[in-house]
Swiss-Prot record:
Origin superkingdom: Bacteria
Family to which this protein belongs: Belongs to the pseudouridine synthase TruB family. Type 1 subfamily.
GO annotation (BP), single: mRNA pseudouridine synthesis
UniProt key word Transmembrane: no
Gene Ontology MF annotations: RNA binding; tRNA pseudouridine(55) synthase activity
Keyword set, alphabetical order: Isomerase, tRNA processing
Record protein name field: tRNA pseudouridine synthase B
Membrane as UniProt keyword: no
Active-site residues, as the UniProt record annotates them: 40
Amino acid sequence: MSPPGLVVVDKPAGMTSHDVVGRCRRIFATRRVGHAGTLDPMATGVLVLGVERATKILGLLTAAAKSYSATIRLGQATSTDDAEGDVVRSVDARHLTSQAIEAAVGGLRGDIHQVPSTVSAIKVAGKRAYKLVREGQAVELPARPVRIDRFEVRDLRAAGECVDVDVEVDCSSGTYVRALARDLGAALGVGGHLTALRRTRVGRFGLEQAYGLDELAECPRLSYSLDEACLLIFGRRDLSADEAEAAGNGRALAAAAAGNGRALAAAGIDGVYAACAPDGRVIALLRDEGARTRSVVVIRPATMQDGTS
């Protein structure tokens, strides 16, 4: 059995995120592999995978902020807001000045309401939006709040009657960079779509920690053990042996260190935090609720605490 942990993969273009999971299932010889945060097939870059019990924490990673390098083509709008769709509108964009582009980019920073791209995995009445679009159905997705902490122009260059804009983006989870490209083009009156996308960071995990799939095939290895990952991502709380046993049973709300049924007191730590046994191993992820705690994920059940895994 593979040890539990996270693998930071540099996803190549042309593969779906599920393709990467399938490849890593073969590399690590386990079916228990999942990913945090889908990348479109045309995109490259950071894809965080969980192996074995580390799949339990992937849902918490999907909410992490993300960073991207991207190229936006101004002067063409497409059916998918990226280069994989059909061109539905072309406008000569050669008149655009760098000042006009910078001003439009600035208008898309901060807290905004973004309409996701219709060709997306968002569910509408139980079906993925992209499937409805393929069936010829009209799809209207509601705008939702996202935060764009950085949207910076790195380079501008002519591409025929279009203008290609290289940008860097730091954004909240749930942001569609394709939609940013669309909205930038709309703000400038010329249309726009995404021609390249590379994710450079997911939360604490960046390209500097990422492995290529060929590297992993030659030498399967984790980027972080499950304990290392939990302590990197979350705050830490040290438990007594009795508290650790209770947390391992999922009884954090009634973790009686002395068998008296009292709830485990709040730690005063914001958000989810890692609860550690006296030997330093992570037992569970907890969250304060008022004066008490709630178990979010049991990392190491009580039945495993006598072992070394």
